[in-house]
Structure formats: structure tokens, C-alpha cells
């Protein structure tokens, strides 16, 4: 029975194995340790993530390595995205600490364990080379997030948001699975590299493939939160506890980018003309509806939700312009610009939601725009940090957000005259988007505060928020640090 069994190479998946083991151990330890502040659970969670980063460094070979019967791949792209993922989740956990302690219904060990399992799901997605691996990682992430959104059981809004997220998430998973089944029916394989080989070989029913591709792109669009599959984003961002909104609004974007590259670029590049046409529509609609709807919002979390939709639409421009008329010479430049954009957005989003968490306290959620009136009078330093984050999101020179937009736009322009209209549309909607970011700056600096008490926050929170804001500014001066990392990782992975 076991004559043909081959022991897989476990080394490429060592960080995933370590994280899964530690998540289960932390769950058991949390039951045994009596600690109302969950300090032990928090510290173990952070050490686990740092341990994952150390293992990732130690086991990285820089080569493309397949294991588990080619279902799992380890390459430089996955290494880089996972390292940014660990860093993001560590920051998210630090930002969330005070908020979670102040809310009894959330101050449980399960919060940290669910965050670890969600991280594990993202790690699996980033390294997936098989439809089933993608689906397993996606469901592990989604189920963890559904539970995290519903953790504040005292809030009807949170419960409602969790239900909407669950129902629409199940629908998206169904679309993705149906698309995968159609592509499997046409190619006879579930392996992403195997699908690419079959398509290059020819003799595949293209009508079935394109039909499957439509469902696949719809499922991916939901996970990215782009129009018209964005319905869940505003309600979930606003309804979820702010610490969970921070988690949803940052780390999963890295995993979503990875599966777009794995599925569309690694697997279905021969169908580029078909999926590019779909992504152009999704991108333009997302930039239009995201930016225009954000203007009307009075709730900062909801405004940032529509902002996220527009940012993901902008990111898709880089994916769209990778292959032009069958010519892939611009692919590395285009895809690395999108990767840089996603990493920049995650950094900016983490800092912005971190500011909301710092201003929130027990019984008070600092999520209305009016809560930021006169912040400069209450805390000039943190008003300055928020200003840098808003300027960066708006794409004001010389912050990281500006260079993220600039790198994508130059990739679009380099693709040729046929794409020039896309660059013009992107610039126009970026200018419209600048309005609602600058409105926050106006409220902080030119309106009178309703509450003039100085802003108080723990020292570790103050240091981390300050570092986050300064990173947005410094990486705007030296963007080539991350740009070159993205380009090199994709050069060695595609």
C-alpha cells in the first residue's frame, strides 16, 4: 500500500509547520494560564511570528523549490511576501493590544490564535502551486476572519457584518471553485504549472477555459475587493472591531496579490488577452466607484474601505500591462510595480488604522471624521504622523504612496499608446481621491477640537505609530530599497 509513498521535502514548508504547531500550543497554553490581560498569549504570538521570519530566512535558497507532489512552491516571491506578512501581523498585533484589552468580549486567547490561523492560510496561499492548495489556504483565512469579525458579541453591527461577510464569502468561494473545476475539465490537471504546460501544448477547448476563467476572475475580484464584487468591504470595515478591520485591510492584500500572480501569470498567461480585458473593466470601475463613494463618507473606517477598493483597482493596472499583444518584455517591470504598490498600501493602511486604534479607548470608537477635528491642538506630533499617512495615500510627493502610483503609471505608459487612456483615467481618479484624504488633514489642522484633552497612549504604541509614519516618509525618499527587492524576487520566480 505504501510502496510508492515518497516522503515530501518538509524544509520549504518549515515556517508553515512551525506556525501551525505553535498556534495549537498557544491555544492549549491560554487555557492553562490565568491571565486577564492575556500577556503570555500575546508574547507567544509575537515570538511565533518572529520565529517564522527567522525560519524563512534560514531555509530560503533563492531557487524555485516544489514539494508535496508539486502542490507547494517556495521561491523568492513567496519568501519576500511572507516576510512582509510576518512584519505586518506583528505590527497589527501590537496596534491591537490596548484596544483588545479594553473590550472584555474580545480579550480572549482565541483572538490571537485566530490571527495565527489566518496568517497560516495566507502563507499557504502565497506558496500555492495547485488549485486545492489555494482553496485550503483561502478557506483557512476566510473562516478565521469570519470568526474575528464576529468576536465582539456585544455589538449587533459586528454580528451583522460577520453574517454579510460569511454569506458573500461563501458565494465567492463557490465561484472560484466552479472556475477551477471548468479549467480542470479543460486541461485535466489541478497543478498551476501543469495547466501552463497544457496550454502551451495546445489542443485545449478554449471556450470551456474562458468560461472557467470568468468565474475564476470573479472569485479573485471578491477577495481583492474590487468592483463589482466589493459589496462586503464597506460594511465589514465599518462593522468589524477596528483591530479586526486593521487585520483585514492589510495582510490579506499580500496573499491576494500572490494568488493573482500564481493563477493568472504563472498558470493562465496564454489567456492574457482574455483576463486582461476583464481586469481593465474591474480596475476602472474600482477607481471610479471607490474614489467617488469615499467622498460622501463621514465615517473614517467606511471612507478607508472605499479607498481600499480604489487602491486595489490601481494595483490591477500593473497586472493588466504585463503582456502586450503577446509580448512579455514589460512583464517584470509591470508585475514588480504592482507588488511594490501592494506592499506600500499595506504599510500605509496599517499606520492609518493604527492611528484610529490609538485614539479609541474603552467605550469610545474614534471612527467618525469629526473625532479628528483639531487633532493638531491635542497632539501636534501624531497629527503630523496622520498627515504623512494621508499625504502618502493621496499620492503626494515625496511619500511612498506617490512612488507606488508613479511606478504603476510608468508601467502603463511603457506598455504603449493603446494603454495611455488608462494612465489618464488613473491620474484623474487619483486627483479626485486626494480630496477626501486632504479633508482629514483640514479637519485636524483648521477645525476646533470637540475635546481638548491631550492624546494619551502607551509608549510602545507611540513609538510604533511614529516609526510607521516615518517609514512612509523615508521610503518615499528611498523607494528603490523595496522596488529593487520586488523586481529581483519576481525575476527569480516567474
From Swiss-Prot:
Give the EC number: 7.1.1.-
Per UniProt, subcellular location reads as: Cell inner membrane
MF terms in GO: NADH dehydrogenase (ubiquinone) activity; NADH:ubiquinone reductase (non-electrogenic) activity; quinone binding
Kindly give the Pfam families that the UniProt entry links to this protein: Proton_antipo_M
Q: What gene, per UniProt, encodes this protein?
A: nuoN
**Its membrane topology:** Multi-pass membrane protein
Q: Does the keyword rRNA-binding apply?
A: no
Superkingdom of origin: Bacteria
Top EC class for this record = translocase
Protein name in the entry: NADH-quinone oxidoreductase subunit N
> Which Gene Ontology BP annotations are present?
ATP synthesis coupled electron transport
Q: What is its main location?
A: membrane
* UniProt keyword Transmembrane helix present: yes
Q: Any stretches that span the bilayer, and where are they?
A: 13-33, 39-59, 76-96, 109-129, 131-151, 166-186, 209-229, 243-265, 275-295, 304-324, 339-359, 382-402, 412-432, 463-483
Q: What function does this protein fulfil? A: NDH-1 shuttles electrons from NADH, via FMN and iron-sulfur (Fe-S) centers, to quinones in the respiratory chain. The immediate electron acceptor for the enzyme in this species is believed to be ubiquinone. Couples the redox reaction to proton translocation (for every two electrons transferred, four hydrogen ions are translocated across the cytoplasmic membrane), and thus conserves the redox energy in a proton gradient.
User: Cellular component terms, GO, for this chain's entry?
Assistant: plasma membrane
Keywords linked to the UniProt accession: Cell inner membrane, Cell membrane, Membrane, NAD, Quinone, Translocase, Transmembrane, Transmembrane helix, Transport, Ubiquinone
NCBIfam families referenced in this protein's UniProt entry, alphabetically: NDH_I_N, PRK05777.1-5
The UniProt family comment states: Belongs to the complex I subunit 2 family.
Q: Which reaction does it catalyse?
A: a quinone + NADH + 5 H(+)(in) = a quinol + NAD(+) + 4 H(+)(out)
Q: Which organism is it from?
A: Dechloromonas aromatica (strain RCB)
Q: How does it assemble?
A: NDH-1 is composed of 14 different subunits. Subunits NuoA, H, J, K, L, M, N constitute the membrane sector of the complex.
